[in-house]
Each structure stands twice: as structure tokens, then as C-alpha cells.
């Protein structure tokens, strides 16, 4: 939410503890940092618990064979995870290989931030020590599934190595290049291209390990009435592993069920007698035109790069008559042209005004997303009111919700179905890690060209798209784009954005790439006139989207890394991040 994917009103910020929105608004502060995990009772508290466990587990006399090694490995992986959470937010952090006695002299307790390379090495060392002794997920006892598995630790290491190779952490981007700790040691080393090779080779190793054990992208649904609906169902299922099981794609699953659906799904009515009403759903989180435009056309290209796109800016009305879109788009009916001829991930991820949204089985639960004021998905009020629940964009987010649970029973059904498991990492991410790292290391025409395109195209093909070569070669304005390193970088970045939209990646990806300004993070979010009572009014009479939230600010001189709480920096003596 601190990126630009979700858009919400003031009520969501002040009533639902969605503090990351304030980061996107430009309201981060060193006095009381938003999203702070450094200070007291933060991650260092849990790292201390990990150290305590590792220091004393050997004193337990009645462990069964293998438990010492396995349990120690699980905690080492957990400690590595906590270290990585610090790295993502703050860059170089303070390493704690062993606990410091609380009665130690103050100078011993005042530890320096370690150089970035040392931090990465500490994380990967912990994972290397853990992985040989971790149990594969499918072999774990039911009572141990919520602890780190071999696949999860391997996937985490692949992600860590990718971040370590990325511009923010690999040499640093301005203003971090010359950052030093209090003893004058450089915290960021010079850029090292070999880090991309290390990340790429390890990603390939993990993929080979996973595929040899039956992991694959979820695909092959044939229970729906059209190929498009089958593909949409595949994409929906890729995020689910109820009770830590029944997924060929989930490689890291964490304990705990997210309640985000309560704020994403609309209430659908005002009283319990309304046929689709649910009083525990709020629908305050929408999305915006920037995200809508990120999705490809049906040809697998950005709208601006598809020479066959016939809808101009997309802000006029048009009709769909192709039966392949049955039960997705109302056929023969005026809808916004921007919503036509788009890729399956658009229809699987976004509930767009004027299109259908399956909210339970059967045709009676196939609902038209009518976001005009006074309609089922629209506002009932005659003004935007910061004191109440409102969707201020007209768009809803399907990602991470189930189309087979009726709105009325969603709360009960989803809590029963998930059984405390949330997918944290998918095989698709490993494919894109490998593609990105090999492209950065040697470009698209090196020795690993096949790996790059095989990995990238596997994700696209599951999503119902042509290969990169076919999309750009046959339909693209620049048919040679994928043969250039910069062009392929843009393709891979966009693929990552689309495939993992609303899964918590974009906030960190844009930072590690150093592309926040190019991505428009200083531009206010745009969407539609949700007070409009006709489609013409709603879509602003064809004049394009309007500003729906007035705050958006990113300062590249400070905002790529979080501030350490100023009080913490003063007491501990550590150097503060630049700009804070």
C-alpha cells in the first residue's frame, strides 16, 4: 500500500491502520517512522529470541534423532528472514551473531551498522547452514508445516541474492554511494556485475530442484465455459495453498490468514435483506489508472507498443462481440474501450466498471460491476466523505480473493478454507528472478539466452499470452526490443509488476531498481468520477480520468531507504540513512 497499487480515501488511512498509505503520501518521518521494525520490540527483539534458541537448544537432553539439526535449521532460516526484512527497509544494518548481555558496558552495546556485503553474506550463510537440514514441505508433519521448509529457505536465498545484485544494494544509488558508518567504513561497495551471475545461477539451481520434485505453474483448468475463464481460474488458484497443501506453485507458505479481503471486497448493499450483502466487507481499497494501464493488451504488449490497438487512449466507449469474452464482458454493450482487448491477467486481477465479476458459483452470482453512484458497486452518498467507507476509484481488486465463494458467506467460507496459510512465494517469482538476473549479467544475446526466454515465456504462457518473441516480433511497434538489454529489462520489469501486482512486491521492486520517479510516484492517482450517475458522467465524458487523491510524494534523495527512528539513532550511535 505504500507503493501505487492501491488507492483509498482518508477513512481507510485513519480507521484501518493502513499506515503504508502515508508513505506513498510523502509523510514518512524519522521521529516516528511508518512501518518501523528497527526500534524496541521490532525485528531485533525476534532476532534475540532466535539467538537465545540457538544458544540453548543443545542443552535439551531428550531430543529425538534429527530434531536438534532440524529445529536449529528452522530458526537459522527465520533469523535470515528477519535480517532480510531489515535489509529491504534500511539497507546496511547491525548484525547480531550472538546476543549481547544486557549488563554489558554501553560501548559494547553500541554496535555499528555493517557494510552491505557483510549483511548479505550473513543472511546467505545462515541459509546455507539451514538448507541441508530442513525438511521439504511435502514431507513435513502437519504440526510443523508453518516452520521453514527446504523450498522456502532456497526461495528466500534466491530473492536475497537478486536484491543484493540490484542497483539499490549493489554499489548503491545516489545518495547512498558514499555512505559510511561511524568508524568511516564504506557501507556500500562498488557495483559488482558478478552479483547478477551469482543470483542467476542460484535461481536456476532452485528451479531445477523444484521442477525435479513436481513443482510447476498452476494451469490446465478445464471446468469453465471458455478458455479465457479457464486461464483466469488458473491465475486465481496460483495464490492458494489451503492448510499448506494442494499447490504445485507455492514454494513458501507462511502461517496466518490475511484479512485484506475485508477491505478489498465490496459490501454490496446497505442492509442484510439485500441479496448480496455482507456486513463484514468494506470495499475501501481500489486501484487506479496507472495500474490499469500496466496490463498488456491481448497480444501481450503495452498498449502504447501494440500496433494493432484500435482504441486510442481508451477513454471512449466501444463494444465487444467476440464470444471468447462471454461472462467476462457484456457482449454487444457499450463499455469503456480501455477495458477491451486486454490480457487475461487484467480480467483475473481487476474488477473493472462495466465488466462482470463472479462472486460465487452460477449465473445468479455473476455480477455486473456497476460503480456509478446509487448502483450495486457504487456510492450511496452524494459526496466524497472522509468519515465513511468509500471506494473512490470505481475499480475493485480481485487478486487474492475467491470467485467461488458468495459474498454473503465469504467471511465464513474463506476462514474455513484457508486454515491459516498464506502463500508468500511462488515458482513464477523464481522464473522471473532467473530471467532478470541473466539479462542484467549478459543481456539477451549471451550464453543464457534460452534460459531468459524460457523462464519469461513460461509465466506469460500460463497467463494466456504469446511468447515475448511473438508479441513484439509480430505485433510490436519496436519488433527488436527484446533483443536489446535495456528493452528486455523493461519487459521483465513490467512482467514482474503485472504477475505480482497486489502481492507486496512492487513497493520493494521499484526501490531496488531505483525507478520511483520514472514510475510516476510523484504523480497523483487518477481514476473515474465515482459520483457520476450515468456512464457518461462516470467516465468523465470521454475526457479521461481525474485526480482522486491529492497526495503523492517521493523524494529520491531520501525515500529509497526507511529512516531509523531518530531517538534510536541518537541513543545507539549508529549513522542515520541519508536525507533523514
Model regions: which residues?
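Conserved, well-structured interaction surfaces
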Residues: 10-90, 106-150, 315, 335-340, ...
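Long, intrinsically disordered, low-complexity segments
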Residues: 43-46, 122-124, 162-164, 182, ...
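Alpha-helix C-terminal capping/termination sites
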Residues: 85, 89, 163, 170, ...
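Structural helix-adjacent loops and short alpha-helical linkers that scaffold large soluble proteins
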Residues: 61-72, 194, 442-451
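C-terminal substrate/ligand-recognition segments
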Residues: 324-462
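An aromatic- and glycine-enriched ligand-binding surface/loop that stacks and positions planar moieties
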Residues: 1-16, 93, 151, 161-381, ...
Amino acid at each position: 500500500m505504500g507503493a501505487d497499487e492501491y488507492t483509498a480515501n482518508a477513512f481507510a488511512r485513519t480507521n484501518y491502520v493502513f499506515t503504508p498509505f502515508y508513505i506513498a503520501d510523502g509523510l514518512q518521518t524519522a521521529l516516528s517512522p511508518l512501518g518501523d521494525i528497527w526500534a524496541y520490540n521490532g525485528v531485533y527483539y525476534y532476532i534475540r529470541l532466535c539467538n537465545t534458541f540457538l544458544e540453548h537448544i543443545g542443552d535439551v537432553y531428550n531430543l529425538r534423532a534429527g530434531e536438534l539439526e532440524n529445529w536449529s535449521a528452522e530458526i537459522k532460516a527465520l533469523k535470515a528472514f528477519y535480517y532480510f526484512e531489515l535489509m529491504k527497509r534500511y539497507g546496511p544494518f547491525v548484525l547480531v551473531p550472538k546476543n549481547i548481555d544486557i549488563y554489558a558496558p554501553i560501548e559494547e552495546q553500541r554496535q555499528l551498522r555493517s557494510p552491505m556485503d557483510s549483511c548479505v553474506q550473513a543472511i546467505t550463510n545462515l541459509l546455507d547452514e539451514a538448507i541441508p537440514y530442513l525438511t521439504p514441505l511435502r514431507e513435513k508433519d502437519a504440526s510443523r508445516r508453518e516452520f521453514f521448509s527446504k523450498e522456502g529457505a532456497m526461495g528466500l536465498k534466491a530473492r536475497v541474492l537478486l536484491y543484493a545484485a540490484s542497483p539499490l544494494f549493489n554499489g548503491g544509488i545516489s545518495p547512498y554511494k558514499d555512505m559510511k558508518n561511524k568508524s568511516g567504513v564504506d557501507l556500500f561497495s562498488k557495483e559488482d556485475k558478478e552479483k547478477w551471475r551469482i543470483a542467476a545461477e542460484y535461481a536456476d539451481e532452485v528451479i531445477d530442484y523444484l521442477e525435479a520434485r513436481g513443482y510447476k505453474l498452476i494451469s490446465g483448468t478445464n471446468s469453465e465455459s471458455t478458455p479465457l475463464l479457464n486461464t483466469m481460474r488458473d491465475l486465481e488458484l496460483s495464490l492458494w495453498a489451503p492448510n499448506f497443501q494442494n499447490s504445485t506453485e507455492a514454494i513458501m507458505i507462511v502461517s496466518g490468514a490475511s484479512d485484506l479481503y475485508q477491505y478489498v471486497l465490496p459490501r454490496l448493499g446497505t442492509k442484510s435483506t439485500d441479496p448480496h450483502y455482507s456486513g463484514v466487507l468494506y470495499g475501501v481499497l481500489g486501484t487506479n489508472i496507472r495500474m490499469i494501464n500496466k496490463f498488456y493488451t491481448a497480444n501481450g504488449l503495452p498498449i502504447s507498443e501494440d500496433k494493432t490497438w484500435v482504441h486510442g487512449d481508451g477513454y471512449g466507449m466501444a463494444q465487444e462481440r467476440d464470444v471468447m469474452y462471454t461472462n467476462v464482458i457484456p457482449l454487444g454493450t457499450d463499455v469503456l474501450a480501455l477495458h477491451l482487448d486486454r490480457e487475461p491477467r487484467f480480467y483475473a486481477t481487476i474488477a473493472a466498471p462495466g465488466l462482470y465479476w463472479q462472486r460465487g458459483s452460477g449465473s445468479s452470482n455473476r455480477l455486473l460491476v456497476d460503480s456509478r453512484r446509487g448502483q450495486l458497486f457504487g456510492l450511496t452518498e452524494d459526496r466524497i466523505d472522509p468519515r465513511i467507507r468509500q471506494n473512490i476509484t470505481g475499480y475493485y481488486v480481485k487478486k487474492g480473493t475467491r470467485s467461488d465463494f458468495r459474498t454473503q458467506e465469504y467471511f465464513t467460507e474463506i476462514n474455513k478454507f484457508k486454515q491459516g496459510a498464506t502463500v508468500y512465494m511462488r515458482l513464477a517469482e523464481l522464473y522471473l528472478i532467473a530471467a532478470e538476473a541473466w539479462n542484467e549479467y549478459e543481456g539477451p544475446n549471451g550464453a543464457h539466452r534460452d534460459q531468459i526466454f524460457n523462464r519469461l515465456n513460461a509465466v506469460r504462457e500460463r497467463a494466456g499470452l504469446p511468447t515475448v518473441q511473438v508479441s513484439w516480433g509480430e505485433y510490436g511497434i519496436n519488433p527488436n526490443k527484446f533483443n536489446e538489454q535495456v528493452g528486455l529489462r523493461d519487459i521483465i520489469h513490467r512482467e514482474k509488476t503485472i504477475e505480482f501486482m497486489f502481492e507486496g512486491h512492487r513497493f520493494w521492486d521499484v526501490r531496488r531498481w531505483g525507478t520511483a520517479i520514472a514510475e510516476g510516484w510523484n504523480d497523483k492517482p487518477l481514476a473515474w468520477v465515482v459520483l457520476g450517475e450515468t456512464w457518461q458522467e462516470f467516465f468523465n465524458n470521454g475526457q479521461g480520468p481525474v485526480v482522486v487523491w491529492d497526495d503523492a510524494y517521493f523524494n529520491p534523495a531520501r525515500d529509497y531507504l526507511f529512516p531509523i527512528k531518530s531517538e534510536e539513532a541518537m541513543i545507539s550511535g549508529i549513522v542515520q540513512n541519508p536525507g533523514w
